[in-house]
Amino acid sequence: MSDLLGILKQQGQSEEFDAIKIALASPELIRSWSYGEVKKPETINYRTFKPERDGLFCAKTFGPVKDYECLCGKYKRLKHRGVICEKCGVELALAKVRRERMGHIELASPVAHIWFLKSLPSRIGLLLDMTLRDIERVLYFEAFVVVDPGMTELERGQLLNDEAYLDAMEQYGDEFDARMGAEAIRDLLRQIDLEDEIRNLREELPTTNSETKIKKITKRLKLLEAFYESGNKPEWMIMDVLPVLPPDLRPLVPLDGGRFATSDLNDLYRRVINRNNRLKRLLDLNAPDIIVRNEKRMLQESVDALLDNGRRGRAITGTNKRPLKSLADMIKGKQGRFRQNLLGKRVDYSGRSVIVVGPTLKLHQCGLPKKMALELFKPFIFSKLEFRGLATTIKAAKKMVEREESVVWDILDDVIREHPILLNRAPTLHRLGIQAFEPVLIEGKAIQLHPLVCTAYNADFDGDQMAVHVPLTLEAQLEARSLMMSTNNILSPASGEPIIVPSQDVVLGLYYLTREKVNALGEGKIYSSAQEAQNFYEAGHLDIHAKIKIRMPKEDGETGYHLVETTVGRAILAEILPKGMPFDYINRTMTKKVISKVIDSCYRKFGLKETVIFADQLMYTGFKYATRSGASIGIEDMEIPDDKASIIEHADNEVREIESQFRSGLVTNGERYNKVIDIWSRTNELVAKSMMSKIATEEVTDAKGNKVRQESFNPIFMMADSGARGSAAQIRQLAGMRGLMAAPDGSIIETPITANFREGLNVFQYFISTHGARKGLADTALKTANSGYLTRRLVDVAQDVVITEDDCGTDTGILMQPLIEGGDIVEPLHERVLGRVVASDVYIPTQTEPVVKAGTLLDEEWVEKLEKHGVDQVMVRSPITCQTRFGLCAKCYGRDLARGHLVNTGEAVGIIAAQSIGEPGTQLTMRTFHIGGAASRATAANNIQIKTKGVIRLHNIKTVTHENKNLVAVSRSGEVTIVDEFGRERERYKVPYGAVISAQDNSPVEAGQVIATWDPHTHPVISEVSGRLKFVDLIDGITMNRQTDELTGLSNIVIIDAKQRSAAGRDLRPMVKLVTDEGDDIYLAGTNVPAQYYLPVDAIVNFEDGSLVGIGDVIARIPQERSKTRDITGGLPRVADLFEARKPKDSAVMAEVSGLVNFGKETKGKRRLIINVSEDQCHEELIPKWRHISVFEGEHVERGEIIAEGALNPHDILRLLGVGALANYIVNEVQDVYRLQGVKINDKHIEVIVRQMLRKRVITFAGDSKFLVGEQVEESAMLQENDKLLAEGKQIARGTPILLGITKASLATESFISAASFQETTRVLTEAAVSGKVDELRGLKENVMVGRLIPAGTGYTYHQSRKAKRARAAAGGDSSATHTVTASDVEHALSEALNADNHEH
């Protein structure tokens, strides 16, 4: 019994720790771990296969090879436990102690630990203030270092080569001490007085001015303080003793054929021991210095290889030229200890099989093959068999199961009832990739899956496989049932929309069922109920599409009945509607979108149970009527429009016209290309339109004999229209024309495929089709990997974001407005704020009382109210502004999207956010090839046509008035908005430079009016004053070419690229100036800036030197480069760039301060732009000359306004415009990419990630804190320190937020375990060890790795109670925190447990 107690106690020990600390090990500590020294390189005896004594597998040091058996065989059996054999010296214990007992090697000469030497920045180098190169010269015996200068002129740490050393010896004799090798470095480290050094550096810091020096001092200071505070001693970075890994962790296993497979570590250890022993021998023999030195160097190298092979010099290779795997390689990378064993574990009780469709299942069921069930539930069956007395022993039960006796099947039925199982489909990209079902036993060998969960799993039945897992414990079963059951996962956690939505056949069936047909059998009849109509239909007296009237009960709680116009099919559908659901929800043609809306409102109105039943019924009905409809695909169904040939002929003529214009020099090649592409895009649209109108409608005769058009019953049209399968774009390729294709580089090939698939392609057309198809396949493979990596980085950065409190009490938030792009409201306000908590009261102009009070969770009813009152901006709480220290609060997060109520504490919202953003990434990347690479490019926009009536407002647009009275825009970032009579913005458009605006500011405009036009294919250069044109630096043949056209004699002036110019023209800056007739400069209105325009490469000048130019004339035009097709290929890397916060190339220059702009003296290649804030304060920027500067002399700019065009740099946005603007920017940019693909993701997921990117602060003012100016610290750490300082009445530290990319943010997390398991393991662990870091085990990863429940979900309460218990123990010395158990206690507990077991059965 006491033995059992010992085991219980042991198990208890490993559990009870609250944090993990990593530090440097002192030689004493290493010796204390060791059970003996390893003196010989031998492993096992080749004849007896027993471990050699004092060797690498020595049983005396590491423990017995067999349980409780000594090596020589004198003692065997349990009764001698703990005895040490006199003959062979082995202690009798379990053989598994060979996994935990360490040995050690006493090194004859100290060696440096390579991690602290070579891991940049070199820790040893920083401490000694020496360069890595110098230290290496000392360590590898190339130079002497002065350890103690004595009374000489030498300095401590000075390097001497052999000659200098000999000279010094002659000069000073024994007065000084200079040595080589690790011991010299060790002595130098020993001499460092940490306290003294820290004090000196702290005093030196304020007095230094040079940036680099300050950086260096702060680096050193941080390292010294880390050593000082952690209690690590610098000399421990040099090792005298080397620990030896327990032998079972570097095993030697016999293969068949008498050979052995061994871990690489044994080779590496053998080298170290051999060299060490040789060195000992040489030292005993007093060998010559040079030999000893060489041996010491070899010892240093062999220890380096053991710790981190290949870090310095060439990696040591084994027999097969493969580098040996060192200790460092064991822990890093995907196959290392962290990711392979600690974070990824394999499970038992699982099986996998192919899936097939189970259309008869209920939503919570799945079909499980009997064979699998029998195998998976074996232990349950054994215990039941024993319990019922059908088998006496487990062995007998096993036999019965193997014979598959009939009673076994009954018991299996019994065991399986209500025992949920988990189904998982790889890749598991979001939490809906594992769901729980109740198994239904089936014959056959395939798992049956319910069709409605396929969307969540992204499964299809073309050979997909799925894995089954069995939750064993009661808690696991409970969780599976209450949280993971498929019926509990109706809404997608990414967007909050239903994910249990019928698709494909079901949609087609419901669509067919609810369509109307003119003049169908029984049209116009009236029935007393839906049931009666159904009976007539079944009897064959009614067509399913016939328009009829039915007496229906009134809705909205009124009593009585009314007649409803509907069709027979819709009446049938009404039968399965939940009670109380309005009939007009389904009294229409059911497309996929409509069905999704119906399911959504059913969930909101009636809750989970009703919705699940309704969804199932919808599915059964859908399948039934899809079968009845007999819809199929026939070649005849792809109807080619009659006017296709004439449309294409017309396009051919247009293209010929443009070709001839090109030949006569009226347009450039680039313009010609763009125009041709445009013509074919438009033609494709026309053919598609014509084809759709032919396929979509048919002519029929109504009851009165008139010809009418109705929607056709063409199966292909029905499939696309209902949303079951296919799209207009695909039908266009089947029956219209395939259209333009993309070349492998993404550019569009200008000869389109005019044929469609029904007509068939010729060889040339087939060939250019293959580009797209291949590119699609190659992209898929590459991008799947990229997307998976993005998801991994996102999970890593957000893994510890958990809801930890109900309300953090902040009143800040972010301002939400509807997203307006072009004329469309891309996302209305009510969609954006749904499920958020209001941060401050919402008012409307006419009322004094707020419409919505702060702290309200906006649900469907509230947003409807906002919509009704026409509110166009709401301040809502956001994860970005949440004040919770560790984690988030429920109010700032808002609604749990998958459940529809305020989020619960303990919800792991970080992981959900990462999955929601990462999962579609993979989806989208897999989706490129479906259209087969057909180039989809919208015809280039060339005007603004407005959609609503209102008043036009111009926003920061500078215009000049052309002689024909039109306004011409001469600013880049201008916008026009249309506002309604309440002043609410309805439409917003960007106005490009050079657009001709035909309406005045603040003038009323009508819907459909065109208010601006421009040429989409060129960028114009517009004159803002009138005058004579003067060429500067435009020299024929050097900076420009005259391209004369033979046919017309017209010539164009084209600027040559600077890279292609001769040496003479390299530094010339071609530009045009406007001058008066006398040749004086003309200045822009109201400024002293001369009117001059730099001409970029390829610009075409429209006027000759000396011509007269009017205001608003186009002086030159710059052809735009060919357009590339947009798809998520650009998208996924774009998302990654945003989350990594990369600085874009040629990023926009933003104004650092608000003030007036003027230009200073130009330097070579740069312009100096000065912003004057006040008389004495100004800010200068140097901007390269080729950059287009969008502000003019004397203009007023606001801080953060764009001065030079380019991509925005997120770091600048944060610095100049603040956190809110940055959040807005990242959220909108990421959403743009996903929106393009039609993927809905809720904003708050992106906000959670942005919050994690903004965790750090850069200290701007240190106060009395321990921080240094310029240091990066966690916000929570800064707040904690400030709390402490405030309590002591000292000055607090201040810092500004800084943006880190997700990889950097993950590596900069407080938890070193989490960071080390992510990337750059060596660097993270080195840093952590030096500073003696403590991991508080706050996040999810750390807890998974130490084998605990995660502090989220159901594990959250467990962690809370542990925390409370700890606090109690700390406060009152609570005895319950430490258990002392007596043997009798344990016996009592055991007997109780055993009895309880019997009662259960």
Swiss-Prot record:
Sorted UniProt keywords: DNA-directed RNA polymerase, Magnesium, Metal-binding, Nucleotidyltransferase, Transcription, Transferase, Zinc
Keyword Zinc: yes
Tree of life domain: Bacteria
Co-factor binding details: Binds 1 Mg(2+) ion per subunit.
Chain sites annotated for binding Zn(2+) 1: C70, C72, C85, C88
Binding site for Mg(2+): D460, D462, D464
Gene Ontology cellular component annotations, sorted alphabetically: DNA-directed RNA polymerase complex
Positions with a binding annotation for Zn(2+) 2: C808, C882, C889, C892
GO biological process: DNA-templated transcription
The keyword Nucleotidyltransferase appears for this protein: yes
Cofactor(s) demanded: Mg(2+); Zn(2+)
EC number of this enzyme: 2.7.7.6
Gene3D superfamilies, sorted: 1.10.132.30, 1.10.150.390, 1.10.1790.20, 1.10.40.90, 2.40.40.20, 2.40.50.100, RNA polymerase II, clamp domain (4.10.860.120), RNA polymerase Rpb1, domain 3 (1.10.274.100)
Record-level Gene Ontology MF annotations: DNA binding; DNA-directed RNA polymerase activity; magnesium ion binding; zinc ion binding
Catalysis performed (reactions): RNA(n) + a ribonucleoside 5'-triphosphate = RNA(n+1) + diphosphate
InterPro entries on file: DNA-dir_RpoC_beta_prime, DNA-dir_RpoC_beta_prime_bact, RNA_pol_asu, RNA_pol_N, RNA_pol_Rpb1_1, RNA_pol_Rpb1_3, RNA_pol_Rpb1_3_sf, RNA_pol_Rpb1_4
Subunit structure, as described in the record: The RNAP catalytic core consists of 2 alpha, 1 beta, 1 beta' and 1 omega subunit. When a sigma factor is associated with the core the holoenzyme is formed, which can initiate transcription.
Physiological role: DNA-dependent RNA polymerase catalyzes the transcription of DNA into RNA using the four ribonucleoside triphosphates as substrates.
Family: Belongs to the RNA polymerase beta' chain family.
PANTHER family registered for this protein in UniProt: DNA-DIRECTED RNA POLYMERASE, DNA-DIRECTED RNA POLYMERASE SUBUNIT BETA
Protein name: DNA-directed RNA polymerase subunit beta'
Gene of this entry: rpoC
